[in-house]
């Protein structure tokens, strides 16, 4: 089995962050990303790049981090208790994009690499990541295209890869207290190492490189759609689900907070504006009801 090489992974992640930011700036056409580099007392650091108040994107954050620690946190060992007490090295790129126009979906993507060390033992390493889409006023063609892009990038790695990671995404981005998915899904994978380092790294790269290929056409198609106060209010209400999921369930958020990570970078996934409304129910037959009735439950899209 090929040995893990954190150096090449880090180089890819830094380049990926740069390319995604450049692509988003081109889509926005007005605003640019501000870079904010930081260091972590316990070891490591990163660069957060944030775009605010653009023509298309209300806020977009693309974060690179590379951190080390003396002991794996509870969030990382809950499903792998044999790793408790190991030192660790974690690196990744994580992004969340909150568009202005309610007809453009919010999206999230992440690719990451972990190594857990223990004296006298082989290092335990794995890749994880994925991307998912959260529309407010969904269009079926957009969702199908999104999933087709996900399926296309998975295809070279086997016929079973897309269905497996699509299902995992539906299960992971689910809010039990709301009994609904966070959005229309995409891909989610974790603990990837069975095929060896090179092939596992190839797949992680395919996911990272495939994100903008999947998202950019949807932005281009919807960015000039007219909207009013009603659509904006619903967008802000639905953004509340994003906050609920990230603060209550998301393993990445919990990992960052439990390892003493940089709070500003961890919480840059939060939308800049959001609202809650008591006992909201969309009117039957409305565009808002269409989201609940047809999109917030797992479906086969391709």
Swiss-Prot record:
Important for dimerization (site feature) positions: 177
GO molecular function, one term: metal ion binding
Gene3D superfamilies in alphabetical order: Coproporphyrinogen III oxidase, aerobic
Catalysis: reaction(s): coproporphyrinogen III + O2 + 2 H(+) = protoporphyrinogen IX + 2 CO2 + 2 H2O
Residue sites binding a divalent metal cation per the record: 98, 108, 147, 177
Entry's EC annotation: 1.3.3.3
A Pfam family matched in the record: Coprogen_oxidas
Keyword Oxidoreductase: yes
Active site: 108 (proton donor)
Domain of life: Bacteria
Localization of this protein: Cytoplasm
HAMAP family given in the database record: Coprogen_oxidas (MF_00333)
Family matches, as NCBIfam families: PRK05330.1 (NF003727)
Homology family: Belongs to the aerobic coproporphyrinogen-III oxidase family.
Subunit structure comment from the entry: Homodimer.
Entry protein name: Oxygen-dependent coproporphyrinogen-III oxidase
Organism per entry: Shewanella oneidensis (strain ATCC 700550 / JCM 31522 / CIP 106686 / LMG 19005 / NCIMB 14063 / MR-1)
